[in-house]
Amino acid sequence: MHSRLLVAAPHCLLLLLLLPSALPALKVGGLYPRDVMDPEVQEAAAFAVENYNAQSTNDNYFKARRIVEAQSQVVSGVKYYLKMELAKTTCKKIAGKPKLYQEIQNCNLPPENQQEEITCHFEVWSRPWLQKTVLTKDEL
């Protein structure tokens, strides 16, 4: 039994020494790319679009055309960094009756020669244990 341990010990030591170089370098608090189709990214994008429309002074809703890029960072919760393309819809805002994301996504676009698209950079901070999500940044 002892001879097996003595033979295995150098191999285990070698494995432990090589393992860190085989793993990608992860930085605590660093930004990491995310799949734009990830459900958490999709949820953050929906939150960003709803809040963008609530804060926008435009008379019409803007809907998500696509998520161009998504990253996340662990910071007392998760902060999502999203680059999104939005398009102005034909749906008019009605005071006191905001539309939810899925309703906005169902809105039609104007004819192609009248379409207006914008690229936005959003930061969405999610802290699920507090049941709190905040749009911390929206820039055109």
Curated annotation (Swiss-Prot):
Q: Does the keyword Secreted apply?
A: yes
Tell me the compartments it is located in. Answer: Secreted
Q: Which domain of life is it from?
A: Eukaryota
Q: Which InterPro entries does this entry report, sorted A to Z?
A: Cystatin_dom (IPR000010), Cystatin_sf (IPR046350), Prot_inh_cystat_CS (IPR018073)
User: What Pfam families does this protein's entry cite?
Assistant: Cystatin
* Disulfide-bonded cysteines: C91-C107
Q: Does the keyword Membrane apply?
A: no
- Domain Cystatin, by residue range, is 29-129
On tissue specificity, the annotation reads: Expressed by the venom gland.
Q: Which SUPFAM superfamilies match?
A: Cystatin/monellin
| PROSITE patterns listed in its UniProt record | CYSTATIN (PS00287)
Instruction: Give Gene Ontology CC terms.
Output: extracellular exosome
Q: Where is this motif: Secondary area of contact?
A: 73-77
Secretion signal: which residues?
A: 1-26
Keyword line: Disulfide bond, Protease inhibitor, Secreted, Signal, Thiol protease inhibitor
What positions are marked as the site Reactive site?
Answer: G29
Which Gene Ontology molecular-function terms are recorded? cysteine-type endopeptidase inhibitor activity
The protein's job, in short, is: Inhibits various C1 cysteine proteases including cathepsin L, papain and cathepsin B. This protein has no toxic activity and its function in the venom is unknown. It may play a role as housekeeping or regulatory protein.
The UniProt entry's sequence similarity note says:
Belongs to the cystatin family.
- Protein name according to UniProt: Bitiscystatin
Q: Which organism is it from?
A: Bitis gabonica
